[in-house]
């Protein structure tokens, strides 16, 4: 039955591509949507397809991961396609449809796609599969050696945001919002929590992090609004998250709370790209250079060395960083923050 659904989906995609001439972007929330790389993409001999359960216009994770693929593809002359806002039940069928169409690389930005990727990778040994935030042990589970995990250091991601939260909180209470209970999300939460507490202690204050809450869905912006309001009521004044559109909903609630109070006193730290200026409450961003990680996968596909490895992203190799800070962060605090970031890079943070 799944094979039949996959074949039908492939037919629909072929007709869709023919109708639109292979270009254009449709992010309306249907099972498939076609993306574009650039003016040279149509002549490329290599093609990459991304699947995503959130929208690529969500202002967060989905958008950042899509842009990473497009940027890496543009640099190397690859053609791109994307299927976004897909349900969990459609992960496998959507992947298979791209494999049937002869795509060279399937890019799945999230640990939640692991089972579908491994199943498809077994059936299509000549297709490469890149799993962003995939487990360290996932490549070894691929019987054909055609799966690579791209793994930003989750603890360091949490540290980058947690240190800023520890410096900026006035209430001593900070908050973290998740979408799904993934190992990578828990790693970010724990890193955020320990860094906020440590930096707070260094600055002479006690900082606690509320228990993580999960929406169960990366697209549930309404849950972000609900969670943020409840956490603000519990005293949280700095937020971080790993929940895509849910984070966008949280920022909406934070902006509304600040507007009601007449001042910006509740803050949000964005990720995984620079979103400074998108919402008034955003004071900084933790940035992951996913484009460089995806680009390494494309290079490996081209030279025939792809698969069976974990590619790590860290502060030390430049894949992780903190971007520009808002003017809401005082100059002396910005200087202290840079000092803590330097400690993270040289390995002395929390030592």
Feature locations, PLM:
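Positively charged n-region of N-terminal signal peptides that target proteins for export
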Residues: 1-9
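C-terminal motif of bacterial Sec signal peptides marking the signal peptidase cleavage site
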Residues: 16-19
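Bacterial signal peptide processing site
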Residues: 21-24
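A residue-level marker of the well-folded mature domains of exported/periplasmic proteins
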Residues: 29-351
């Amino acid at each position: 039955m799944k094979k039949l659904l996959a074949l039908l989906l492939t037919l629909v995609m072929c007709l869709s591509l023919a109708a639109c001439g292979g270009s254009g972007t449709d992010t309306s929330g249907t099972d498939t949507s076609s993306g574009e790389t650039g003016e040279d993409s149509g002549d490329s001999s290599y093609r990459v397809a991304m699947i995503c359960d959130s929208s690529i216009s969500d202002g967060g994770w989905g958008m950042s991961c899509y842009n990473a693929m497009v940027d890496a593809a543009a640099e190397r002359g690859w053609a791109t396609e994307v299927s976004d806002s897909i349900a969990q039940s459609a992960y496998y069928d959507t992947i298979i449809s791209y494999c049937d169409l002869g795509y060279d690389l399937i890019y799945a930005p999230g640990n939640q796609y692991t089972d579908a990727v491994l199943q498809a990778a077994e059936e299509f040994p000549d297709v490469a599969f890149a799993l962003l935030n995939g487990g360290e042990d996932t490549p070894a589970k691929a019987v054909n050696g055609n799966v690579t995990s791209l793994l930003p250091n989750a603890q360091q991601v949490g540290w980058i945001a947690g240190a800023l939260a520890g410096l900026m909180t006035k209430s001593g209470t900070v908050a973290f919002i998740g979408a799904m209970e993934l190992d990578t999300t828990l790693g970010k939460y724990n890193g955020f929590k320990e860094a906020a507490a440590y930096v707070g202690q260094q600055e002479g204050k006690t900082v606690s992090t509320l228990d993580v809450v999960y929406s169960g869905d990366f697209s549930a912006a309404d849950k972000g609004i609900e969670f943020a309001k409840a956490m603000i009521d519990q005293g949280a004044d700095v937020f971080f998250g790993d929940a895509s559109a849910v984070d966008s909903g949280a920022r909406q609630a934070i902006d509304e709370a600040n507007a009601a109070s007449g001042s910006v006193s509740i803050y949000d730290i964005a990720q995984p790209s620079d979103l400074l200026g998108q919402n008034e409450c955003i004071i900084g961003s933790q940035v992951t250079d996913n484009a460089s990680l995806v680009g390494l996968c494309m290079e490996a596909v081209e030279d025939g060395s792809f698969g069976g490895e974990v590619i790590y992203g860290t502060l030390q190799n430049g894949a992780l960083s903190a971007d520009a800070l808002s003017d809401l962060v005082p100059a002396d605090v910005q200087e202290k923050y840079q000092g803590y970031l330097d400690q993270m890079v040289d390995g002395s943070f929390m030592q």
